[in-house]
Amino acid sequence: MRSRGFLFQYTPMLERILFRLPAVLLACAALVHSNALAADAVEVRRTEGLMHGFLVLQNLQGKTLADGEMTQVARGDRVTDNLIFRFQDGSVYEDKTTFSQHRKFRLLSDHVVQRGPSFKHPMETSIDASSGQVTVRYKDDDGKEKVLSQRVELPPDVSNGLLFTLVKDVQPNVPRTTVSMVAATPKPRLIKLLIVPQGQEPLSIGKLQHKATHYIVRAEIGGVAGLLAHLLGKQPPDTHVWVLGGEAPAFVKSEGPLYQGGPIWRIQLAGAGQF
């Protein structure tokens, strides 16, 4: 591998270093940028409730990779979301999130499982927001199972598993909204997410014409870590989310990585099934 006139010998050790580089960058970002952006939990403009929907996950060329299903059950001001994708190659991604919605959205717990050939590194992450306990189970480069468990001081705006919910309540006329997220690198690191509205775009559903608000969700990495990420091409890609506005906002589509270091995938509402 050649870079700027220097010759590097590509070895297994170098491969392991390159794989771990995104984790190092995020770790630096957490230290350098932990207090750079003020953040607060998103206010509840419309309460969540009972829901059962179907999704499709595709690559950007339109090939279907997985079928998805999302359910939502509310008990009082406590809501549980369960999102699952079943891939054609047998892989599974599941995210179960519980949160409260008394004036502001507050994460209570989040449990994510990703396994199968669609994921380079199988991983299971559990977050207990009340105690700050974060547990990550994963396999290292040699295939050995590892467990990391630590307490993290989680802010009220931690948003793991809540992105599709929060964007429906973000004010589209606010220049940007900042929330926090625990990134499993695999060591748990607290980072910031910027949610920036990009304006409205036309949306057609058959003969019906609507407008959807386009949001960009960006992982904020500043300082030296951000510069290194840019130079080395390791800057986390933006996630794009489209939300149907009005009195009953609804998720329409997203384009972004489903997991750290993953490819850009498109998630959108599935068409009606056949009876």
What annotation goes with each model-predicted range?
Residues C28-L37:
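C-terminal segment of classical bacterial N-terminal signal peptides
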Residues F6-L25:
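Bacterial N-terminal signal peptides that target proteins for export
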Residues K139-P175:
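Surface-exposed beta-loop interaction hotspot
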Residues A39-S131, R176-F275:
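Acidic, serine/threonine-rich low-complexity disordered tracts
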